UniProtKB/Swiss-Prot annotation:
CDD domains for the chain: OMP_decarboxylase_like
Native species: Neisseria meningitidis serogroup A / serotype 4A (strain DSM 15465 / Z2491)
Gene name in the database record: pyrF
SUPFAM superfamilies tied to this protein: Ribulose-phoshate binding barrel
Binding site for substrate: 22, 44, 71-80, 130, 191, 201, 221-222
Name the UniProt record assigns to this protein: Orotidine 5'-phosphate decarboxylase
List of catalytic residues: K73 (proton donor)
Keywords attached to this entry: Decarboxylase, Lyase, Pyrimidine biosynthesis
Length: 246
């Protein structure tokens, strides 16, 4: 098994898959999750679902045995982000993220806020959104390639005390070389078939490609949530992960 995965999972739950629960309400979410096995995946709640349902749904999913990635991408003054991370830790959240562009003081405050917890959430920096291309960066005044900006922000996140970053699979290999084997790389934009890309994720890869590139966790939304048999998809991705690790 990939040592990066086993470092952050119990022996009963060593899977790289994070399922993005891209639903808009509690009923649909619980109806989908009811058929999932917490040993096959972690789960992620983003802004839409959390805004619609609040912490009650998040805590319910944690109580069902799921490791929860609270994907709210904090970006605020250091005190506010630190307090938000403490609340997430109190809830039992497994992973929480923030924009690395919020700067060193913000990230250091977040790391300090959760340092005293026996089981603290993984703190993950968001580097460059996977929907963004070089032209998008240029429009906001960053005349650099996405890959260069990702590495710059990832180094800042690591030196500020974060556990890892969100990055596309294309950036995983250079980040692994730059930041070492213990830094967590969370990769969205994962598709079972790269030709099947109807949404706003630009820099995509298959599970096997992403794992080979050095990704630790694979975020999958519609390829799982809209599958005819989501459990079969999860089992297949985990099979690929086991092959890749051995």
């Amino acid at each position: 098994m990939n040592p990066l995965i086993s470092d952050f999972q119990t022996p009963q739950q060593r899977t790289p898959v994070i399922v993005a629960l891209d639903f808009s309400n509690e009923k649909d979410t619980l109806g989908f999750v009811r058929n999932l096995d917490p040993t096959l995946c972690q789960i992620k709640i983003g802004k839409e679902l959390f805004t619609a349902t609040g912490r009650n749904l998040a805590e319910s999913l944690i109580n069902q045995g799921f490791k929860l990635f609270l994907d709210l991408k904090y970006h605020d003054i250091p005190h506010t982000v630190a307090q938000a991370c403490k609340v997430a830790a109190d809830m039992g959240v497994w992973m929480v993220d923030m924009h690395a562009s919020g700067g060193r003081r913000m990230m250091e405050a977040a790391a300090e806020a959760v340092a005293g917890y026996g089981t603290k959430p993984l703190l993950i920096g968001v580097t460059v959104l996977t929907s963004m291309e070089q032209s998008d960066l240029a429009e906001i005044g960053l005349n650099t390639a996405p890959e260069e900006q990702v590495i710059r922000l990832a180094k800042l996140a690591q030196s500020s005390g974060l556990d890892g970053v969100v990055c596309s699979a294309q950036e995983a290999a250079p980040l692994r070389r730059e930041l070492g084997q213990d830094f967590v790389l969370v990769t969205p934009g994962i598709r079972l078939d790269v030709a099947d890309n109807n949404d706003d994720q630009r820099r995509i890869m298959t599970p096997a490609e992403a794992l080979a590139a050095g990704s630790t966790y694979l975020v999958m939304g519609r390829p799982v949530t809209q599958a005819a048999d989501p459990v079969a998809v999860l089992r297949e991705v985990n099979r690929v992960a086991n092959l890749e690790a051995n």
